[in-house]
Amino acid sequence: MRLSSVFAFVFDIDGTLVDSNELHVDSWDRAFQRFGKQFPRDQLRAQIGKGSDQYLPEFLTPEEIKRFGKELDEYRSELFRKEYLPKVRPFPKVHELFQRIHDDNKRVVLASSGKKADTKYYIDLLKVGNLIDGYVSGDDADSSKPAPDVFGASLEKLGKISPAKAVTVGDTRFDIEAAKNAGLKTIAFLCGGTPESVLREAGAIAIYRDPADFLVHYEELMASGAER
């Protein structure tokens, strides 16, 4: 894939543009405990990046999901929105990165497995509403990551462009898997906490520390067209 031919970027949000992954772990931990379940934090963290439809089956039996899965998910979502969302902070240089991409006449769509209300909150937090071409949330897809639905819907937002003309940017192996399932390549960031070895094994075509690091190397990467 020659990155110099890329027409659009599809960005994940949590752990990629905003520092929220540990806050999600905290909220899931508290939600499970409220319903009498407790799991090691490293196990909870390892599944961050999935939407709740994919996350809950990793920890609950089908019978448990039927009995209280919806109630737990709603409790967790409300808990995160009330107590944790105000604590989320952008990673450095996100606005500058999006401005650079915009100045390069390339398009951007945000794609999250999270709730639509949270996604809209992040757009305001990042102050990038005038620099993006749209967004897709988990509410817009039948199945969340690692299913391809969210990224497929993102391509629709871009006018049904070929996957060869777009690249995703994410922070977890689930982003990379979902992108692959949609025919897309992925640039990965380390700021979400996933080890570099895991991202490389999953198939990331390039890995950067965070949005600021990507911004530093953006011109070089796009000019060379090379994978890193």
Regions found by a protein language model. Give the residues of each.
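Conserved short alpha-helix immediately C-terminal to the canonical SAM/SAH-binding motif I
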Residues: 17, 24, 118-119, 150, ...
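Substrate-recognition/cap helix-loop segment adjacent to the acidic, metal-dependent catalytic center
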Residues: 26-29, 33-35, 55-66, 87, ...
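Short amphipathic alpha-helix with an adjacent loop that forms part of the alpha/beta core around
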Residues: 217-225
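Acidic, Mg2+-coordinating phosphoryl-transfer loop and its flanking beta/alpha structural elements
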Residues: 112, 167-209
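N-terminal helical cap/lid subdomain that shapes the substrate entry/recognition surface
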Residues: 2-95, 100-106
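Short beta->alpha linker loops
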Residues: 23, 47, 51, 89-93, ...
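Conserved Lys-Pro-Asp/Glu-containing loop-to-beta segment of HAD-superfamily phosphomonoesterases
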Residues: 8, 145-176
